[in-house]
Regions:
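Extracellular low-complexity, O-glycosylation-prone Ser/Thr/Pro/Gly-rich "stalks"
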Residues: 25-47, 55-64, 69-193
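Fungal secretory targeting signals
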Residues: 1-21, 187, 191-193
């Protein structure tokens, strides 16, 4: 007979195993800093080097925002947000420029000057690609209520019927070449695959 604590541990392990990883691919030529913020938890500043990568296990049960800044200080008006939520084994995700866009321009938004993208390797998922210098309100939040303020549907993407056991790739300066790493000093392989 299982005890309540054994069942609780098994349920927790199943929840953790059900989610993939949130991966930041920084294709920019400069470092960025990220903060992972969820309900009741927030990380300190995490440096992601130029042409580098950061990964963390995805959280389920509450929305998570990965806030991106060009400095090690998180200041309102100067950060981009990659956001995701896993609810009832369904992943939802979006990009928000609400804290940095000025009108139709995302030029003040970290990582956006070179384009931003968000996707999963799972083909059932939608994908976001907001190219550099483009106004892309159907791909990212420029205002907090696009239906009311712009007459556009919410730019939230999902993976219909695919569950949540997958990675979610968030790319800064997405117009640049994908990240590569050397294998045995002889060949380059795609870090983002």
């Amino acid at each position: 007979m299982f005890s309540k604590s054994t069942l609780l541990v098994a349920a927790l392990q199943a929840t953790l195993a059900a989610a993939g990883n949130a991966i930041i691919n920084n294709r920019c030529s400069t470092d960025i800093w990220v903060w992972s913020v969820g309900q009741g938890s927030s990380s300190s500043a995490i440096r992601v080097p130029a042409r580098g990568q950061y990964s963390e296990p995805m959280r389920s049960g509450s929305p998570t925002a990965i806030k991106v800044s060009n400095t090690d200080q998180l200041q309102n008006g100067k950060h981009t947000q990659f956001e995701y939520s896993i609810v009832n084994n369904q992943m939802w995700f979006d990009i928000s420029f609400v804290n940095c866009a000025v009108g139709e321009s995302s030029a003040n938004c970290p990582g956006a000057a070179g384009g931003l993208a968000m996707s999963s390797p799972n083909s059932a998922c939608g994908s976001i690609n907001c190219q550099s210098g483009k106004y892309c309100p159907s791909q990212a939040y420029f205002v907090d209520q696009p239906m009311i303020k712009l007459g556009l549907k919410e730019p939230v993407f999902t993976c219909p019927g695919a569950g949540a056991n997958m990675d979610l790739n968030m790319v800064t300066c997405s117009d640049s070449q994908p990240l590569k790493r050397s294998v045995a000093g002889r060949m380059l392989v795609d870090m983002e695959a």
